[in-house]
Amino acid sequence: MSQVSIKQFAETLKLSVDKLLSQLEEAGVSGKKEADFLSDDEKMTLLNYLKGLHGEKVDAPNKVTLKRKQVQKLNLSSGAGKRTVNVEVRKKRTYVKKPETVEEPVVEEPIVEEAVVDVPEMDTAAETKATKEAEAPKEKAAEAPVSPETILDVVPEPVPVETDKKHKHDKKKQNKAPVKEEPKHKGKPKPKEKQSKKTLAMSGDQSFGRRRHKGHKKSHNADNEHGFQKPVEKQVRDVPLGETIKVSELADKMAVKATEVIKTMMGFGSMVTINQVLDQETAQLVVEEMGHKPVLVNENQIEDDVVNQDYNGETVQRSPVVTIMGHVDHGKTSLLDYIRKAKVAHGESGGITQHIGAYHVETGHGGVTFIDTPGHEAFTAMRARGAKVTDVVVIVVAADDGVMPQTKEAIQHAKAAKLGMVIAINKMDKEGANPDRVMQELVSEEVVPEEWGGDTQFVRVSAKSGEGVDDLLDAILLQSEILELEAPLEGPAKGVVVESRLDKGRGPVATVLVQAGTLRKGDIALCGMEYGRVRALVNETGEQVESAGPSIPVEVLGMSGVPVAGDDMITVESERKAREVAMFRQSKHKEKKIARQQKSKLDNMFNKMEEGEIQNVNIILKADVQGSIEAIVDALVKLSNDEVKVSVVSSGVGGITETDANLALASDALIFGFNVRADAKAKRLIDSEGIFLKYYSVIYEIIDEVKRAIEGKLAPDFKEEIIGVADVRDVFKAPKIGLIAGCMVTEGMVKRNNPIRVLRDNIVIYQGALESLRRFKDDVPEVRQGMECGIGVKDYNDVKVGDQIEVYERVEVKRTLD
C-alpha cells in the first residue's frame, strides 16, 4: 500500500484531521502534522489501537478448545419389553498454536486486511490431512519440519502432528507468490474420507503416473494440473464465405457453438435454425458481429474455368438466326411451312404452335435458321427465349386483324434485345386485308416503315399463295449482311437449349442451337445441371448427322436428364469435369431452393396471420416438353387472387406415374396431363381413390378448367333486392304484440320474416326484421301491392305516420373471374 498524507487518510475515513491526529497520539504515533505521510506500520498501529478500544483482541488466541456432545438412542429388548436408552458421547479437542521455527518464508508487503485474525477454523481437507499424518510413524514425524499448528486431542488417542509437506518442494515454491493460509472449519475429522484425485499433470511434473505403494510413505503431492495455458486474447479467424452457408457450418468455421450464431441472428431480429441456409451478405454481417474477419470466396471458380474458353481459330460467316413472332393465328407457322415446303401447322394441336421449333432451311438466297415461337399469351417466356438467341426478328401481322396484344409484346422483346426487325404483313390474299391500317397501328408502336421515312422493312406476303415470300427472304438476308454475322468454326461448341423433352424411346432430348464451334457426336456436353456424352445428333428432318456448326439447330441425345430450356450448352474435355460442374450447380440450386422455401414459409405464416386462411387449388402438371410446362405454370399462377391461390405442387416432363398419383392424394391436387398419359399403376390408383385427372392438348382448355375450379372456391356475393314498399298510414297498439303500423303496400309485396328497413324522409332510421304481418286480424305469409296490412317491426317501437317500410331479400350471386 502506498503512503498517503494524514489529510487524505482523514478524507478516506470521513473524519476530521484533528480527530485523526488525536487518535494517532493515543495510539502512540505522535509528532504528526496534517501534511505528514503515514506509513503502513503506523496505520497498523492505529488499527490495533482502535480494535483494542472496542474490546477486540488483536492477536489470535494461542489455545482453542472445542467441545462436542452427541446424543444417540438405543433400543434394548428385555423380559419386560422394549426399552429406549439415551447414550451421550462427549468429546473435547484442543488446538494449540506453536511458535514458528525453521526458515522464514518470503512475505509480501502486509496489507491492513491481513491484520484481522479470526478464530482459526478447521476445514475438511485439513482434518483429513491431519488424520493421515496422525497414522504415520513417529520417526517420520520427527524427521519432517514442525508445523505452525499441532492438534491435541483430549480423548485418549495419540496426538496427531501435522507435518508441513510444502517444505519438501522449497525449490519449486521459492519463485512463486506466497499462498494464503486456508481457512479452517470446525468439525470432526474424517480419517477414512479420500481426497479427490486429479487426472491431468502439469508439464514437467515427474510424479505424475506413479503408483503409490502402501509400504512407501514418500510424498508425491505435487499439484497435478494441466500443463497448457488457456489463451487470454480472443482469436480472430479468417472465415471463408461462399454464396450460401449453413448456420452449423458457419459456427464450425468460427470455432463457436451454433447456439452463439443463433443468438447473434436473434439480435438481428431473425429467427433461424441450425440447418438453415444463410446468404453471403447475412453471413458476412454475423461474422463481423462476432469479431471475426469474413473472406468472400468465389465458389464459381470451377464453373468459370470450364465455361470461359477462348477461341483462337478463324471466324467464318454464319447463317442468320431468324425468329418468327406475332399474335396467335396470324399465320407464323404457315408462312414457315411455305418456306420449308412442309406442313408443320397441321401437326400442332388446335392448329396453334405450342412448342418452339428450330429449322435450318437452305434457300436460293443462302442458309437461314428459323425459330418458330408460340403466339399465345401464355408463352411469353418462350418468346423471350427465342429473342435471346436470334439475330433478326420477323413479326407477322395479319392484314385483316391488325396489331394485337402479342404483336405489341413481340415488338417489345425485339427492342429490348436490340435486334433487327422485319414486319411481314400476312394474309394479303384475303378480302378484308387492309395493310395501310396495319402500318398506321405499327407507327403508333414506334415501328415506322422505310417508305414513310423509318428504318424498318415492311413486306406484304401471303403464306397461302406464296406472294412476297422471296421479298421477305431478301429482306432477312439484307438485314443479316448489315449485322456481319460471324462465328468460330473450330473449338469447343457453345449453344443454347431451345427446347427439351423426355422421349419414351430415346430418353432426354434437348433441341440445341449451336452458336459457336462445332458440336460432334461423342463430345461431352454440359447443359445447366445435366451432362452426358452426345450419343446422336438429329436434324430437323429426323436424319442423324455427325456434327453441327454455328447457327445449326440439332436434337442432342445422351444427356443425364432433361435440361431446362434456356440453359447454355458447352462441350468440355472430360466427363469428370462435366460431372463436377453439374454436381456443383445442382447443390447450389438445392441450397437456393431451400432458402426460398424457408422465406416462403415465413411469408405464408405472416400472410395467414394477417389475412386469415386462403383457399388453395393444388395442381400436378405433366407435359411432353419443358417449354410447355414453363408456359402453363406461368399462366396458371397468374390466375391466383386474394381469396384463392393456385399452387403447382409438382411439374415435370414425361408420363403420369404412381408417384404423381400418391402426391395428388396427399396434397389434394388436380392432375393435368398435357400431351401425356398415365401408366397402368397410376390409373388403378387414380380410379380407386377418385383423384381428379384430365388430359389436354390445347393450353386454353387447362386455363378454363382451373378458372372453373377457382370460381368454385370463391366465396359467393350477396345482392339485396327490394321486393316491396309499404307506407305507414296509422299507428296503434295491440295487446301482447306492441306497436303495430297500419300500412298500405304501394310496391311489390311484403313477406313475413324478411329483413326490412324503416325510412323517414328517405333516410334509413332502422334496419331489422318483420316480426308479424296481419290482414283483418289474420296472420298472413304475404301481402301484395294495393292491399292494407298491419306490420309489427321486431324490437322497434318508434314507427310514425308517414314512414316507409322497405322489405328486401338477400340473393346469392355466384362469382366469376371475368
UniProtKB/Swiss-Prot annotation:
Q: Which HAMAP family match?
A: IF_2_B
Recorded source organism is Hydrogenovibrio crunogenus (strain DSM 25203 / XCL-2)
Write down the Gene3D superfamilies for this protein, in alphabetical order: P-loop containing nucleotide triphosphate hydrolases (3.40.50.300), Putative DNA-binding domain, N-terminal subdomain of bacterial translation initiation factor IF2 (3.30.56.50), Translation factors (2.40.30.10), Translation initiation factor IF- 2, domain 3 (3.40.50.10050)
Cellular component, GO annotation: cytosol
Region described as G1: 326-333
Return one GO MF term: GTPase activity
Q: Which domain of life is it from?
A: Bacteria
Q: Which PANTHER family match?
A: TR-TYPE G DOMAIN-CONTAINING PROTEIN, TRANSLATION INITIATION FACTOR IF-2-RELATED
Which residues are noted in the entry as GTP-binding? 326-333, 372-376, 426-429
- Residues of the region (G3) are 372-375
In which family does this protein belong, per the annotation? Belongs to the TRAFAC class translation factor GTPase superfamily. Classic translation factor GTPase family. IF-2 subfamily.
Which stretches does the entry tag as region G2?
351-355
Where in this protein does the record put region G4? 426-429
The tr-type G domain, residue ranges? 317-484
Q: Does the keyword GTP-binding apply?
A: yes
Provide the protein's localization: Cytoplasm
Q: What is this protein called?
A: Translation initiation factor IF-2
Region (Disordered), start-end ranges: 128-228
- Compositionally biased, Basic and acidic residues: which spans? 129-142, 178-196
Cited InterPro entries: DNA-bd_dom_put_sf, EF-G-like_DII, IF2_assoc_dom_bac, IF2_II, IF2_N, P-loop_NTPase, Small_GTP-bd, T_Tr_GTP-bd_dom
General function of this protein: One of the essential components for the initiation of protein synthesis. Protects formylmethionyl-tRNA from spontaneous hydrolysis and promotes its binding to the 30S ribosomal subunits. Also involved in the hydrolysis of GTP during the formation of the 70S ribosomal complex.
Q: Give the record's keywords alphabetically.
A: Cytoplasm, GTP-binding, Initiation factor, Nucleotide-binding, Protein biosynthesis
* G5: region residues: 462-464
**What gene does this protein come from?**
infB
Basic residues biased stretches: 166-175, 209-219
